[in-house]
From Swiss-Prot:
This is Kelch repeat and BTB domain-containing protein 2. Residues 133-223 form the BACK domain. GO terms for cellular component: host cell cytoplasm. CDD domains: BTB_POZ_ZBTB_KLHL-like (cd18186). Keywords: Host cytoplasm, Host-virus interaction, Kelch repeat, Modulation of host E3 ubiquitin ligases by virus, Modulation of host ubiquitin pathway by virus, Repeat, Ubl conjugation pathway. It comes from Cowpox virus (strain GRI-90 / Grishak).
Amino acid sequence: MDIENDIRNRRIIRNISNLLDDDILCDVIITIGDGEEIKAHKTILAAGSTYFKTMFTTPMIARDLVTRVNLQMFDKDAVKNIVQYLYNRHISSMNVIDVLKCADYLLIDDLVADCESYIKDYINHDTCIYMYHKLYEMVHIPIVKYIKRMLMSNIPTLITTDAFKKTVFEILFDIISTNDNVYLYREGYKVTILLKWLEYNHITEEQLLCILSCIDIQNLDKKSRLLLYSNKTINMYPSCIQFLLDNKQNRNIIPRQLCLACHDTNYNVCNPCILVYNINTMEYSVISTIPNHIINYASAIVDNEIIIAGGYNFNNPSLNKVYKINIENKIHVELPPMIKNRCRFSLAVIDDTIYAIGGQNGTNVERTIECYTLGDDKWKMLPDMPIALSSYGMCVLDQYIYIIGGRTQHIDYTSVHTVNSIDMEEDTNISNKVIRYDTVNNIWETLPNFWTGTINPGVVSHKDDIYVVCDIKDEKNVKTCIFRYNTNTYNGWELVTTTESRLSALHTILHDNTIMMLHCYESYMLQDTFNVYTREWNHMCHQHSNSYIMHNILPIY
């Protein structure tokens, strides 16, 4: 019986392969390098690739009789090999790095695992820098972490090799800025690595400033400090000299201003704009408008540039466009679009990688998560959330993205809500779940449930604690409550304090040791702060000329 099954299986594989060879019933055309085309079958490709499965089941594409897919950005031989692989054919020879990159993009997990196994057998002390050069941008893949561990553990000897002398700046920055406790170098040794690399490489002023910011100047030993201060390259750049002088004493890093993403209700609720707000004077200035009159988008700050993603306008139920806005020169740049259309979601930022999580897509609520690293030409899908969520609260702490509450079913497309954290009526579609995403190991974890279901709570992290700010309705009135969860003890949620609610959307940010809440109400800017140490509230009110509905607040350092 086993022999018969084996013969039958081989016959099925041969029949499928013949379809590819004979161009029979093909319904997808893949364009590769030099404009060459490969004809294939959606069903076969979707069976082995999550990327193709998602693409071909999208309603607009599913209606196409023949779908065209552009993979010209990858090595054409690698794409050919992958198509052969999906038709269950043996790959006789391959450039494993090119195949791995393409297989990872197409979400072909089995082939990625095969490539990782091949690389693991090949990698050694002499080749680890070369391989890391080729793959360091793919840090989400386990084999890349394995190569990095090998590199980091051997760096004392590797810095004398020709391979290290030719290392690109991005690898140097990755080595010195690592926050892996196992390979966390003492500050003096970071200086040794930097100065050795500077002997053989050119570096710009901006790049050198980035590297220096990864070194704790205050805790340098005397010898390392003298070597750093006397280096010719460092002394070429005034900003680097000033940085060293400014960091002789410890300085707290706190936002100097806030970026406010708002909607100007004096004109039109669909007229979004960006303000820069001075925390101390409570003064603000309009610096930009947001493209396409979108609402319920997600926003974030990366290197003090504003990222605007998704949302919707009344011509489109949801969008996938992404924009970057420079705060200084106000220039708008369109970035690669997200794979999924999203609104009522959040963007998390860890280092220079942006994560788009859940949200509403048409009449569906998404479980999907995708990420984009600045400088790349595409977004990539990551493991789905345990549940579908939109309008949740979110914050980042270390390598984790924390998600609190949210909606589990879609809501109709309406204008921006002035009150978006209060459940005034019973709603069974509001979640009290708390989950977090481990961006290093690419897994979701479930944490103790929140006290109650909540929509768009304010969430911030302070040291090892997560604070949630939300409005809760009791029998008499509505209170603004602050809850705390310690990430070390896992003891559940503690109610820290309550105060009278302002009945407006709670936009929350951590400023120094205080939780700051900003509200725009009619012609007033309201600023409430709560000190996490003294547990004291401070309420301030400032009148301004225009009327805004605030959508998000972001720190500018």
